[in-house]
């Protein structure tokens, strides 16, 4: 039977259409996915993301452990609260998961990992933590609420105590702070400013209702997916998985190669891929005619040598903000500015862009 988050009854009270999402009953929408999408781009919306897994790590060698476990380097994290995005790789360089890691103190770090990969992530982390004597604690006692949009921070702050407002004052993106019972982070999955707030599960429903009263509209998984696609953000299981290299998933920027002596898991395989060159890459596609780009559709183009090449759409949808169809696609190296997508046996032209279409509500790719 599918699990329920602490906000399950709140979703029903707001008329949500519920679906089973990787073993969790989650809201798909509350009546209109399109309205919810625009709500986040233009004002503020909130998402129940309590199905995500929060993992706390503790011990004197936690930093050393994470420098081995993760492709990005936590040596960059020198200011308490600072976070970074990274892949957690297997020995062959495939992506076990993408996650956010927060530096809390020299002996405490926090990870936020995906729900779909929870069991294998926790097993992998725990197994590799043992030689470092790092304590691994899965925080099932916490709920997680994302408040996103241009008005997200101002409206959410009306619910904060004076101490909490002071704690987040001037906080830059990709930081987190514990302020009383709330862990408030300036992160998100929409391309908009906002907060992701972890709080005791027993307090989640009350906080959700306070956000509703403050004018924050609930939004479901449908809008969350089109928002992240417009922002060019990866979805695990589509843009990457254990058989896909981060170099083929627009995650090359999350790999810290120096110092060369840092022996992170997957490094040897990635170095071989990098040396070989000409691997696959993730690109953006924008539809120039009517039609909708869908996951799994083939992408064709002719390379500089005149050879026909084929890739695949990993995520595709209509973009409510741009009014056209957009997609992320994994393709062989050498693609130009135009390609062809086969839709119902029709060859449809698409424009090739960088993987990212909307930032802070504005078009960056058309």
UniProtKB/Swiss-Prot annotation:
It is an enzyme of class 2 (transferase). InterPro entries: GCS_T (IPR006223), GCS_T_bac (IPR022903), GCST_C (IPR013977), GCV_T_N (IPR006222), GcvT/YgfZ/DmdA (IPR028896), GcvT/YgfZ_C (IPR029043), TrmE/GcvT_dom1 (IPR027266). Its EC number is 2.1.2.10. GO terms for biological process: glycine decarboxylation via glycine cleavage system. Keywords: Aminotransferase, Transferase. Transmembrane segments: none annotated. This is Aminomethyltransferase.
């Amino acid at each position: 039977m599918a699990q329920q988050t602490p906000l399950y009854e709140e979703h029903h009270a707001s008329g949500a259409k519920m679906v089973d999402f990787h073993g969790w009953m989650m809201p798909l929408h509350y009546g209109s996915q399109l309205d919810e999408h625009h709500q986040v781009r233009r004002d503020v919306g909130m998402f129940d993301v309590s199905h995500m897994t929060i993992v706390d790590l503790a011990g004197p060698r936690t930093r050393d452990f994470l420098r081995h476990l993760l492709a990005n380097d936590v040596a960059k994290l020198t200011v308490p609260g600072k976070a970074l995005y990274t892949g957690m790789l297997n020995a062959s360089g495939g992506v076990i998961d993408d996650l956010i890691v927060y530096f809390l103190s020299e002996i405490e770090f926090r990870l936020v990992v995906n729900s779909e990969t929870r069991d294998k992530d926790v097993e992998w982390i725990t197994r590799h933590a043992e030689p470092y004597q790092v304590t691994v604690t899965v925080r099932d006692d916490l709920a997680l609420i994302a408040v996103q949009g241009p008005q997200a921070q101002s409206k959410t702050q009306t619910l904060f105590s004076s101490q909490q407002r002071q704690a987040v004052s001037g906080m830059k993106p990709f930081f987190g702070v514990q302020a009383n019972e709330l862990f408030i982070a300036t992160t998100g999955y929409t391309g908009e400013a906002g907060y992701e707030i972890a709080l005791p599960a027993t307090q989640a429903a009350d906080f959700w209702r306070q956000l509703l009263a403050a004018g924050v509209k609930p939004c479901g998984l449908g809008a969350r997916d089109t928002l992240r696609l417009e922002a060019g953000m990866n979805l695990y299981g589509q843009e990457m998985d254990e058989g896909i290299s981060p170099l083929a998933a627009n995650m090359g920027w999350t790999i810290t190669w120096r110092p060369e002596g840092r022996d992170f898991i997957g490094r040897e395989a990635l170095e071989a891929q990098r040396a070989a060159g000409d691997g696959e890459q993730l690109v953006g596609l924008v539809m120039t005619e009517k039609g909708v780009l869908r996951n799994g559709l083939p992408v064709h183009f002719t390379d500089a040598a005149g050879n026909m090449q084929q890739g695949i759409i990993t995520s595709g949808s209509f973009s409510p903000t741009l009014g056209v169809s957009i997609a992320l696609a994994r393709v062989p190296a050498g693609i130009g500015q135009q390609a062809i997508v086969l839709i119902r046996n029709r060859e449809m032209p698409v424009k090739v862009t960088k993987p990212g279409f909307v930032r802070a509500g504005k078009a960056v790719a058309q």
